[in-house]
Structure formats: structure tokens, C-alpha cells
Amino acid sequence: WIAVNDGHFYYQLDLRMSPVSHLLISWIVADKADITRRDRVLVTLAGVAPDIDGAGILAEILTEKTNAPLLWWSKYHHVLCHNIGFGLLLLITVVIFSLKKWRTALLALLVFHIHLFCDYIGSRGPEGYQWPIPYFFPFSDRWQLSWEGQWELNAWPNLLLTALMLAVTIYC
């Protein structure tokens, strides 16, 4: 996609993914590793787990017409689980439940960071809001990762990437 801004041309690649895309990429990483079936499930879930903080959208939709709407998605998505604190909790959980402890834990940490990276470069909403990633939360909120070149959530490369990941999952 090429955009013109102040007479300059910009080429942008969108890697923002839906939870389905995060799941597929995490599965591909886990499937290629020398780990047990159980550990593959843990790695795959670790790549999707950061989006747990997006579940607040259900409460927000159900209460939006009330006198006291719950703004759980607006306030907490990309905050509670898109940070190093959650990454460490995820790492400990994977070490506890995996059979090949450190190999599986490192793969889980890898897919967790792939998730964060992809959200970092492509989380812009249709209204132009760029979701920042509070990477050092809960230890510090001073460093918020965001990039002004983020693509919109519904951009065509997202669909293409998901289709490619689905093809790799099915055929490889």
C-alpha cells in the first residue's frame, strides 16, 4: 500500500494480526520445534494469551447503553497482558506445565514477543488510534511502544498474512 503525505510516498507493510493469525503463527513455530504435543499446545497458547486482555470488549458491549458502562476493553486492552510482567507470568506457567521445560519456555517467550511485535507495527484502529504497548508494565509505565506507521486493523495485508499462515499450517 502506498500513501502520499506532504508530497512524500510511504510504503507500509501490515503485520497486525487477529487472534486467529497469532494462533496460526504460534502453532507453526511450535510444530517445527522438537517438543512434545503437550508443549506444542503450551507454546501455541502462549502466542495467543496476550489477547486475553481484549475479552473486556464483551463487558463493554453489554454495558455500553447503561448509566455506568464498563470500559474494560478501552482501558485495559494492550495493557494487562501486552507487557513483560505478563510475559514473565507466562514463562513461569509454561515452565511449570511443560515437559521440555526451558526449550518450551523459550519458544513460548518467542511467540509472546512475536505477538507484541506484530501488534506494535499494526494495531491502528479505524479512527487512527495507535495502540501503545506498555512493555515494562507493571514495573514502569514510562516506556510506551507505539509507531506512527501502524496499519489499520482491517488492511488487506492482514487477510493475506492470515491466509498464508493457514496455508502453511495445512500444507506443511
Residue ranges and their predicted role:
Residues 1-172:
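N-terminal membrane-targeting hydrophobic helices
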